[in-house]
């Protein structure tokens, strides 16, 4: 999905990647 235009911190990126893998 499209991510909002915000500054994501490493923790946010890691969380997103994990969510994508779960999907």
From Swiss-Prot:
Top-level EC class: hydrolase
Broad class of where this protein is predominantly found: secreted
Keywords, in A-Z order: Allergen, Cytolysis, Disulfide bond, Hemolysis, Hydrolase, Lipid degradation, Lipid metabolism, Secreted
EC number assigned by the record: 3.1.1.32, 3.1.1.5
Hydrolase listed as a keyword: yes
Other notes: Is about 7.7% of the total proteins in the venom.
Record protein name field: Phospholipase A1 verutoxin-1
């Amino acid at each position: 999905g499209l991510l909002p235009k915000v500054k994501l911190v490493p923790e946010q990126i890691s969380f997103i990647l994990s969510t994508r893998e779960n999907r």
